[in-house]
UniProtKB/Swiss-Prot annotation:
GO terms for molecular function: translation elongation factor activity. The keyword Chloroplast does not apply. This is Elongation factor P. One of its GO terms (biological process) is peptide biosynthetic process. It comes from Ruminiclostridium cellulolyticum (strain ATCC 35319 / DSM 5812 / JCM 6584 / H10) (Clostridium cellulolyticum).
């Protein structure tokens, strides 16, 4: 069981015969009246997002989510193929389930496949990825004082904002949780 007062981002639990993941939460303690927990929840089966308020003492059964390392192989139309790194078994997953989570993942990278009772509902990419910049405007010496950014296309085709000193061919580290530039690796 999980208590609503212990909610954190990413916690999964069962409620009304559905499985929800906490996307945002806020503990509210008004000057008058009882405290409550305001949440934004994602139904991991349907993908719908709902807002719900809980009493901090409300208890829900925790959903047991399986996370399995699999290698992203390739995509063919609306199907993405992954391979179990232990059994070499291939698993096709449709684009609706994946969403935009593979924007920063290259073929042959290892990702975590999320499932509940055998039903795949999502993918968790590595927290940080290192990708090569394939196209961006050239940077000029002395252009870094303002902290300005420019668009850059990385090798997966995703466009990200980078500092002006980043050039085509540079390897950059990106945080996949926020899809933001972290640093230049080389």
């Amino acid at each position: 069981m999980i208590v609503a007062g212990d909610f954190k981002n990413g916690v999964t639990f069962e409620l009304d015969n559905n499985i929800f993941q906490v996307v945002e939460f806020q503990h509210v303690k008004p000057g008058k009246g009882a405290a409550f927990v305001r949440t934004k929840l994602k139904n991991i089966i349907t993908g719908a997002t709902v807002e719900r308020t809980f009493n901090p003492t409300d208890k829900m059964p925790k959903a047991h989510i399986e996370r399995k390392d699999m290698q992203y192989l390739y995509n063919d139309g609306d199907l993405y193929y992954f391979m179990d790194v232990e059994s070499y078994e291939q698993l096709p997953i449709n684009k609706e389930t994946i969403g935009n989570t593979l924007d920063l993942v290259k073929e042959n990278d290892i990702v975590k496949i999320l499932s509940h009772k055998g039903n795949v509902f999502g993918i968790e990419p590595p927290t940080f990825v290192e990708l090569e910049v394939t196209e961006t405007d050239p940077g000029f010496k002395g252009d870094t004082a303002t902290g300005a950014t420019k668009p850059a296309t990385v090798e997966t085709g995703y466009v990200i904002k980078v500092p002006l000193f980043v050039n085509t061919g540079d390897i950059i580290r990106i945080d996949t949780r926020t899809n933001e530039y972290m640093e230049r690796v080389k």
